[in-house]
Amino acid sequence: RSSRGLGDVYKRQIETHVIKKLPANWKVSAEAFLEAYHVLETHSEGVYTAGDANADYDIFGDHISRFVHTIGYTSPHIEENRPSQQEIYDILMGRRTDEGAGKKLPDGLTAREAYAEHVQNDMKEKYKQDFSSLTVTETIDSIEYFVFPNAFFFPGLQLSMVYRFRPNGVDGALFDLLFLRPKPIDGPCPPPPDAFELEIEDSYTKCPGTEFLGAVYDQDTNNLLSQTKGFKTSLKKGQSLGNYQEARTRHLHQTLDKYLEEKNG
């Protein structure tokens, strides 16, 4: 492990801060990020490099849950014509750099391993720190902790974010999206940037610093209005949740119900 510790979020600086209005309440908005199974439909282009259906989910007491969503594995949903390691590497590198696609996968390395090495070198150049002691999963995977009631923390190197969902009326929410990067080892930490505010109809790609993830966040939240309308018009009074893939969504509501029951006696 790195001596800096990936869990040391206080050793990060805020590089980008987005506040996006969403057309769904804070619970529905948070649910969009509690599971990885939606990749197949919501991020269909990602199925060749994302282990969605085989993501790992863990629950720690009433207030904390986690998923580990691997990058560089092809989805189990793809049963035929699965890409080679070279093809996976091309996709990963093409997303990160304009000139990356087409580079030969180094001998003896998987696409994940080679891509993680590239990310470590890229971040070393940008932030003048050595990240070579980090594991592949610490470097590139989507490792997400949810802290009840409304906060998410990603302690990885490539994917280092914080989410917060706040009520904004009955059927609206404010989504704080913060991209974190390593603090300088020497010298003062730069001041946090002003928040970039987006309306419901605005794309995340309007905000500088979101890079290729801006379009991904558009996909994550573009269906929230339809969900809200569906909740209000459905004859069914509750959600039908998967036993495992949506365990964290159930966990959120079970914990919330405990607090409401205590308050109401």
What are these regions (language model features)?
Residues 11, 38:
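Acidic/His-leaning functional-site neighborhoods
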Residues 30, 34, 40-265:
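Glycine-enriched catalytic-core subsegment of oxygenase/oxidase enzymes
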Residues 13-23:
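Short amphipathic
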Residues 1-6, 10:
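Single conserved hydrophobic/aromatic residue that forms the stacking wall/gate
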